[in-house]
Each structure stands twice: as C-alpha cells, then as structure tokens.
C-alpha cells in the first residue's frame, strides 16, 4: 500500500482548495444553524461533483470519514459551500 503525506486546506467560501491531482482522505465541516452543503468538485466550478455532504441545521462540527485510499481527484479540488462556516479537507 502506498503512503503519502497528508496535508490540509481550509476554505470559508467557494474556490479551489487544492490546485493539483490528489486524493481527499477526510473532511471536517463547521456547520451553521442553517442546513447547508459542501460539494467537492474535480475540474473547477463546473467540474464533476465527487463528494457531496449535506449538513444539518445545527451549529457544530461534522467529521466525514472517507475509507481506504480516499476519493481521487484527477485535476484539482474545488469546493462549493452553502450555509457552512468553514470546511477543512485532508488530502494527499
């Protein structure tokens, strides 16, 4: 099994989180008191949605476990956030 360093990036608005091909290995979302979502796309704002996380209408922290080798993004990792305070992506 190949091992790589795990890095992190945090965003509070839509945008590119990782500007290269990678694997997303985990996600932490700081939710607000309004239901929302986080969509991670491969290929920019119009790219393919690879991970969608719907968040509850409760302020707090939501950790998303991604098994095995993670989810592969071939181009980049772009985040589209709705009604969340922040999202941290663990990748490598």
Regions found by a protein language model. Give the residues of each.
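Surface-exposed, low-hydrophobicity beta-strand/loop segments enriched in small/polar/acidic residues
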Residues: 1-92
């Amino acid at each position: 099994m190949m091992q790589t360093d795990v890095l992190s990036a945090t965003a509070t608005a839509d945008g590119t989180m990782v500007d290269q091909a990678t694997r997303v290995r985990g996600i932490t979302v700081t939710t607000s008191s309004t239901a929302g979502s986080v969509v991670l796309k491969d290929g920019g704002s119009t790219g393919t949605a690879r991970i969608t996380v719907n968040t509850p209408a409760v302020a707090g922290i939501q950790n998303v476990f991604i098994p095995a080798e993670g989810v592969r993004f071939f181009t980049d990792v772009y985040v589209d956030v709705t009604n969340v305070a922040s999202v941290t992506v663990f990748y490598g």
